[in-house]
Amino acid sequence: KGGPIIMVQAENEFGSYVAQRKDIPLEEHRRYNAKIKRQLADAGFNVPLFTSDGSWLFEGGSTPGALPTANGESNVENLKKVVNEYHGGVGPYMVAEFYPGWLMHWAEPFPDISDSGIARQTETYLQNDVSFNFYMVHGGTNFGFTSGANYDKKHDIQPDLTSYDYDAPGWVTPKFDSIRNVIRKYVTYDVPEAPAPIPLIEIPSISLTKVADVLALAKEGEPVASPTPLTFEQLNQGYGYVLYSTHFNQPLKGRLEIPGLRDYATIYVDGERVGELNRCFNQYAMEIDIPFNATLDILVENMGRINYGEEIVRNTKGIISSVKINGSEISDWKMYKLPMDRMPALVSGEPYVYKNGSPEVAALGNKPVLYEGTFHLSDTGDTFIDMEDWGKGIIFINGINIGRYWYAGPQQTLYIPGVWLNKGENKIVIYEQLNNDR
């Protein structure tokens, strides 16, 4: 019939989930796959269907009548063998995800996949009539809180960076040239010149004129009270932050434990930061000293929802367990929601909003703060903002959350598309949750 849709993917890496959920009978998994296929047919998709899995996971991921394609399979002989096994002894043969790079997690080094290795593998596919899809042929950015996360037993959670670079950042690189030089040998037309780099602009200066005390601003809102901590989901909040607060009428010193922390917490006693707990480093406990008549505040951040494997169904955020000190459960909590789903407005003259450089700002110490400022542009264009000297937080540009930064790296710059910038005045708000002297 014509049209732009030539194939439709019925499922993606469902075989990984099947392999990890041995508690569910294989036939039940297969019934799910069959229903997905039926729904696509009922919706009018009459083009070939395919599934996509690691080649060793076809038993759980493939479904009759859909072409099984392999992710990351470099062995052509094995690719053809497993596709034949699950597709009636015939191809076509396709690697649906061929990785010139890899996704990146916070506090881990950049993955390194060589240019020459990718070029050689590209030629191997072409020599053996294997179709392939570069994942990614160009990278992107997980704006806002959309980055997601992986799970493994060592890290518990591996939050993805704001960047989804995949070693393909959007302009010509040596790896691009290596791949291009291989592919041009197998086409009959003249390959056009590579596109010119997108021009970038430089932001001349940014003036941060206002500062706000986030803990105080949060407590201006209406709290939700509960004997035990409530999760983000129980608070009807998907992303961002929740401030958990409780008061002590007696001094208490000892070991603070939050085994159900999801995912990152900064701990404050009477507004003074005393430490951090971090699920990605398996840090769920610390020593704490709470004086008489003091307030304990725990600011919890959702670092990204797990989107691969069996843990996708165990993705509750916030504090999902009791909080204990010396083994005794702490009760009587107030929870303040900070979804950060829109750019906060810092209104001069409002309580807890101060002029930058004032004594009140100096007194904030290492509390979490909001900085607001402006910058002016004569022309717009794509650019990057370097946050290497900051701690941890998020940035809004003209109302848009452009993503997270964190000194743990490896990412230190955030991408700002030119279409989100204005000629003339632009507004920036930085939520800095550590507020270190960096």
Where do the language-model regions lie?
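Carbohydrate-binding surfaces of carbohydrate-active enzymes
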Residues: 1-4, 9, 15-16, 20-23, ...
